[in-house]
């Protein structure tokens, strides 16, 4: 196959929409992706795309499409087939109104997966031989990224495009992520006599206030979310235990280790200053952010594709965490780029403009065709 763009090669919007509808209509929360993996495997086979089923656990698999020479993968397109759980199990499927298509996973990221699959379908139906690019459709991103971690244990490639929703803006920077557990202990008492106890929830609220005040005062800023707050035990008592889970998203240039140390010092100071209060902090999940130089040769190729398709080139940072963090930690340079807007993901109003899904498929296709020389990670 020629590895330069062929004007006769183009995506088929109707086929792409049918694929996206099928993907959205299959419920595939993290850990329960068997149905969608089976469907996508059949779709790839029917369209002439040979794939490898990579085992993640007993019943879950990644799907990996590689060129004939597996050692020649210079760029891998990566998408996750799982979603968060549905807000409404009776009403999560595909719907459309005008150019807008809605449903669980439309933005995050079944539209991106469908666009990637369509691009690869065009590649094989026109020439039969893939350029030095791969496609990895993984599971588990919304929980522990176990699909991406398994992928990186067996395969190696220098570059990736991860199809998270960026509104088609190329993200060369990626926020880091810190999952934080805070725990406070108080003194249990009868609920009608709170003065005899120490309410662990009240002390947690005071601790959270100090933590969030510190976070918002940081010069580069940290995006924080108090994800969960729970008091124990239940019943008619003053709770003597409280846990809070926080998601912290850090600017790409932030030092995760510095933030950890300062949070530990803050909690230690609160613990020492409050009579009877026991405060505890633990970091459950740490993912470093990163930034890719726009001067890298492959990034310049992507910029040329944007110019060819008359798309604005305005690189930004991706401010969530994703499989991109996992790939980066494994030595890959991941560019985050896909259809849809991050602000609609994980909401009951999740949607994407279908015209943008078509645009994504065309961009992925043209970018894949432009890859005709090896690219290695800068030392």
Which residue ranges define each predicted feature?
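A structural signal for isolated positions on well-ordered beta-strands in alpha/beta enzyme cores
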Residues: 76, 134-136, 280
């Amino acid at each position: 196959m020629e590895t330069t763009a062929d004007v006769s090669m183009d995506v088929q919007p109707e086929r792409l929409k049918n694929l996206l509808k099928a993907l959205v209509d299959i419920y595939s929360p993290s850990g329960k992706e068997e149905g969608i993996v089976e469907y996508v495997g059949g779709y790839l086979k029917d369209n002439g795309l040979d794939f490898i089923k990579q085992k993640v656990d007993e019943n879950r698999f990644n799907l990996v499409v590689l060129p004939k020479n597996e050692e020649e993968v210079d760029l891998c397109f990566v998408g996750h087939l799982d979603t968060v759980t549905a807000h409404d199990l009776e009403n999560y499927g595909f719907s459309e109104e005008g150019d807008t298509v809605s449903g669980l996973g439309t933005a995050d990221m079944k539209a991106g997966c469908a666009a990637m699959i369509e691009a690869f379908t065009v590649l094989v139906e026109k020439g039969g031989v893939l350029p030095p690019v791969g496609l990895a459709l993984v599971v588990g991103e919304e929980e522990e990224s176990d699909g991406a971690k398994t992928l990186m244990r067996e395969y190696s490639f220098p570059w990736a495009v991860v199809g998270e929703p960026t509104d088609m803006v190329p993200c060369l920077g990626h926020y880091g992520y810190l999952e934080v557990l805070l725990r406070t202990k108080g003194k249990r008492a009868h609920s009608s006599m709170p003065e005899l106890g120490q309410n662990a929830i009240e002390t947690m609220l005071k601790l959270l206030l100090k933590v969030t005040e510190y976070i918002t005062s940081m010069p580069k800023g940290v995006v924080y979310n108090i994800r969960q707050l729970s008091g124990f035990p239940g019943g008619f008592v003053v709770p003597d235990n409280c846990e809070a889970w926080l998601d912290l998203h850090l600017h790409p240039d932030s030092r995760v280790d510095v933030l950890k140390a300062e949070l530990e010092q803050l909690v230690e100071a609160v613990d020492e200053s409050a009579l009877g209060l026991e405060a505890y902090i633990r970091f459950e999940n740490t993912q470093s952010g990163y930034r890719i130089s726009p001067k890298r040769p492959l990034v310049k190729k992507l910029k040329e594709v944007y110019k060819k398709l008359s798309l604005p080139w305005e690189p930004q940072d991706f401010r969530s965490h994703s499989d991109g963090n996992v790939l980066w930690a494994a030595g890959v340079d991941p560019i985050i780029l896909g259809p849809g807007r991050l602000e609609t993901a994980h909401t009951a109003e999740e949607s994407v403009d279908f015209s943008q899904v078509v645009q994504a498929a065309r961009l992925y296709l043209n970018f894949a065709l432009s890859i005709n020389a090896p690219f290695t990670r800068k030392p």
